[in-house]
Design a protein with these regions (language model features):
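Periplasmic solute-binding protein
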Residues: 1-15, 20-23, 40-71, 167-174, ...
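Short helix-initiation/N-cap motifs at beta->coil->alpha
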Residues: 19-23, 104-121
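Alpha-to-beta junction loops
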Residues: 33-36, 122-131
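Short, solvent-exposed loop/beta-turn-alpha elements that line the ligand-binding surface or hinge
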Residues: 41, 45, 60-85, 141-144, ...
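Long, aromatic- and glycine/proline-rich binding clefts that accommodate carbohydrate-like moieties
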Residues: 199-250
Length: 279
């Protein structure tokens, strides 16, 4: 979760360590007359994908990873009540006009690249923005990490025994033959040195626990690395693992429909129907 340390300090807010604290902070911000969240789903032909990430994060924080796996594989139907509840949990943030910049009607039409800029306006349009490690590339020119912005782990519930789940995507390197050069390269890629060569170039985050963190190009990536290697559960982006017609189709559009007023149950039913149609 990205935020402005100055905005937090000016308002006496502390970084939440649990989901309970995050929910309480969200309400407190709104009560103080501040808007807690910037959320934007617009992404051209991929509009809706940021909301699928919210859903995946919530599923990992409300149910064991086995339930997440069942959902992603459709062993558990998309319209199971657990999934509907997760969608409505997202709605707690996105559908409350007091909680989101521009009101709930702006969520679907606000560009995902533009939505975090509300952190940096004067006065700020929002206090927090949930997005992956790449998003600083779209922050306004001249803002400085650790000064103008920082981040904290999107927290888990203290009341649920689910550890510290982390959601992510990534690059997989696969050997297509076993000739000596390929074998040696694959062996090299297992060593910290291989990762450290990329770490210093920026834009690269590794789950390798044996690397020297000082090799990262910034404190931001050192902090993100700590979140990644500190995960008790890691799961790959669910929509990326689903069939394309769902994960890059009905799931995207369904989340837009939800933010535009369609019920979570109707959205979940429609997504499940689209999945049934390709089986």
């Amino acid at each position: 979760v990205w935020y402005s340390p100055d905005n937090f300090e000016d308002n006496g807010y502390e970084v939440p360590k649990t989901m309970e604290e995050l929910l309480s902070l969200t309400k407190q911000m709104a009560s103080d007359g501040n808007t807690p969240w910037c959320i934007g789903l617009e992404s051209g032909g991929a509009t809706g994908w940021p909301a699928t990430d919210w859903m995946e994060e919530i599923m990992l924080r409300t149910h064991p990873p086995s339930v997440y796996d069942q959902w992603v594989s459709n062993e558990m139907p998309f319209n199971d009540q657990k999934v509907i509840d997760a969608m409505e949990f997202f709605g707690t943030f996105a559908l409350n006009d007091d909680f989101v910049a521009g009101g709930s009607k702006a969520v679907a039409t606000t560009g995902f690249r533009d939505s975090p800029k509300g952190l940096f306006t004067s006065p700020p349009q929002c206090m927090m923005h949930r997005q992956a490690s790449f998003i600083p590339a779209f922050f306004p020119e001249g803002v400085e990490a650790g000064v103008d912005y920082d981040f904290f782990y999107f927290p888990a519930y203290s009341s649920k025994d689910l550890g510290r789940p982390v959601l992510g995507a990534g690059t997989v390197i696969t050997a297509t033959n076993n000739d000596p050069a390929t074998t040696e390269l694959m062996k090299f890629l297992m060593h910290p040195e291989a990762h450290e060569r990329f770490m210093g170039k920026g834009g690269f985050l590794t789950p390798h626990k044996g690397v020297d963190k000082s090799k990262y190009a910034s404190d931001t990536f050192r902090g993100l690395h700590d979140i990644l290697v500190g995960a008790t559960t890691f799961r790959f982006d669910g929509s990326d693992l689903m069939p394309g017609a769902v994960g890059a189709g009905s799931f995207w559009t369904g989340m837009v429909d939800y933010t535009n007023g369609k019920s979570a149950k109707d959205v979940a039913d429609a997504i499940q129907s689209s999945w049934d149609a390709i089986k």
